């Protein structure tokens, strides 16, 4: 039987002090989120494993997450962080690889001002190392990064890459600007067709209006499923960030609605099988 897997969630403790992006007064985000907070939702949904993803640009947070993973059976894998601009961090990558739940890394590219950062010569070693060590790369960005991710995934064809949050299409703006939707759709189709990258069906609600519905998300989910195919798409909650627009269960039900037209076998891929293969969770 295929495991049900949440391919993208976070645990954090703001008092640790390294979540530079986090608004200090946000009533939803600026509070601790720990395994005991998510466990009831996982049990209610029948989800056996999750992929715990970094939320701070520090090695210390990666170590913190691995400690949580050691004590939390539901955490199937951890996506951490290294400094791509510091070649000395190769030793961290090689050391972290020895942890049985360490799966790969995610640089916080969406927060980097230079859209061409990933093309810089001084960060190429990190992409090469991930490829050589057979570790996963979570691609976090916006539509403006699509062309550069295409370049990088072609440059490193053995890199095991997954696109986070469908590359964050700005759903709340697309109702009035169809050209933006077309730009995102074209870029995603090229990534799907010209590289072996995977895609997370996650983060869509956060990019939508507060009164979002599954119907609002359908063009985006449909494009991802059509372009990548269910065997390269994995559902993720993006909890607790999803709580900016709705609770865990609301997004899960919406995602199930968006995938209702798939066969049972394809739904099993999106809600577990793909993530299990990509992150090597059993």
What are these regions (language model features)?
Residues 2-5, 28-49, 223, 227-234, ...:
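Mid-to-C-terminal alpha-helical segments outside catalytic/metal-binding sites
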Residues 9, 55, 166, 238-239:
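Active-site metal-binding loops of divalent metal-dependent hydrolases
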Residues 39, 66-67, 94, 150-151, ...:
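Active-site phosphate/pyrophosphate- and oxyanion-stabilizing loops and adjacent acidic/basic residues
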Residues 58-144, 151-153, 167, 198-207:
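Active-site gating/metal-coordination segments in enzymes
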């Amino acid at each position: 039987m295929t495991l049900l897997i949440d391919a993208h969630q976070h645990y954090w403790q703001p008092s640790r002090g390294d979540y530079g992006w986090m608004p200090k007064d946000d009533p939803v985000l600026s509070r601790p989120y720990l395994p005991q907070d998510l466990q009831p939702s996982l049990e209610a949904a029948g989800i056996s494993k999750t992929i715990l993803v970094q939320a701070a640009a520090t090695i210390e947070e990666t170590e913190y997450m691995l400690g949580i993973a050691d004590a939390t059976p539901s955490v199937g894998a951890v996506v951490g962080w290294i400094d791509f601009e510091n070649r000395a961090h190769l030793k961290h990558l090689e050391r972290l690889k020895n942890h049985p739940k360490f799966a790969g890394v995610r640089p916080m590219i969406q927060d980097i001002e230079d859209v061409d950062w990933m093309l810089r010569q001084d960060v190429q070693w990190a992409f090469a190392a991930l490829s050589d060590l057979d570790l996963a790369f979570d691609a976090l960005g916006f539509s403006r990064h699509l062309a550069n991710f295409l370049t990088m995934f072609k440059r490193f064809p053995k890199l095991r890459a997954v696109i986070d949050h469908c590359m964050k299409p700005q759903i709340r703006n697309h109702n009035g600007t169809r050209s933006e939707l077309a730009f995102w759709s074209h870029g995603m189709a090229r990534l799907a067709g010209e590289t072996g990258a995977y895609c997370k069906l996650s983060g869509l609600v956060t990019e939508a209006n507060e009164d979002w519905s599954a119907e609002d998300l359908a063009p985006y989910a449909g494009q991802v499923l059509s372009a990548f195919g269910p065997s390269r798409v994995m559902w993720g909650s993006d909890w607790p960030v999803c709580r900016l627009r709705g609770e865990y269960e609301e997004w899960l039900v919406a995602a199930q609605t968006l995938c209702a037209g798939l066969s049972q076998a394809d739904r099993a891929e999106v809600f577990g099988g793909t993530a299990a293969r990509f992150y090597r969770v059993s």
